Amino acid sequence: MVTIIPLIKIKMENNHLKYQVVKEQYLKFLSSQEVMSEPFRDKLGQLKNFYLPISRMIKEEYTKEKKTKLIGLSGGQGTGKSTISKILKIILKENYGLETVIFSIDDFYKTLQERKMMSKNKSALFLTRGVPGTHDTKRLYNCIKKLKDQKFKKFKIPKFDKSIDDRLPKNKWLKVKKKPNIIIFEGWCIGVPPQKKKDLIKPINKLEKQKDTKKIWRLQVNKELKKKYKKIFNLIDKLIFLKVPSFKYVFKWRLLQEKKLRITGKGKKIMSNIEISNFIMYYERLTKHMLKILPRKADTVISIDKKHRLKSIKFN
């Protein structure tokens, strides 16, 4: 006698097996990222309520045309962009068989020498990496186009070492040998539009008041957003925004990042509290602008609560 197993039952069993694999890989990854003083909370709840729905949205976007899709992941410093990107990569691979490449806008910072030249020709503030204008936008645009190209050829993505404040040599760049289905492009200013001119008049903090008295720096940053960065952001198929409660938590969570680096011993150059406070002033204007604009502009908004936990998700 032949036993016929309904297709729906087979599908349910396969889905259950996939979930078990995803759960195992997910928990294993989180375990590797934890430090004793800051354990991850509600791990399975976060998987079910956030990571699985987001990965499903990405998969559905890919299924529309079966072409490489660029997913922008935007959020202030310390919001967890790198961790979220890696978790999504695990789920997309194990659940849907999709190959994912992750890279950060940080890896496309101009070299130290290039920023020194820019600081002489434009504003001394451009020596400090971070704001639009301090990235190699031509290289970044070409990289995304190559990854999305149907006639894909293997190539390398730059790597930037923040401990030396410079780009690494080519032999240490990320090798992409296979055409990806999904590209996760993460960074603190991904998808941010330029500001209105009237919003640039008043300095937003001590840095701008004392070191950008003629508005040269912030006007140039805005100019970069209007042209070069807009061209790059237009390539994004879906934009995910990590919304923080307020800018003060960017400082708080950046302190947490430095604390973790001290504990794990991964940081070669750890910043003091005063150094962090001064450093994030460079990011303040655009971070506050993003908090006003991106909750309406992004395709998906993930709100993060004051305790650094994923609080809610909204698909626009």
Regions found by a protein language model. Give the residues of each.
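Conserved lysine of the Walker
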Residues: 81
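Walker A (P-loop) phosphate-binding loop of P-loop NTPases
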Residues: 78
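Conserved NTP phosphate-binding and transfer environment spanning the P-loop NTPase/kinase superfamily
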Residues: 8-25, 41, 48-51, 188-316
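Conserved nucleotide-sensing/catalytic segment adjacent to the nucleotide-binding pocket
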Residues: 101, 110-160
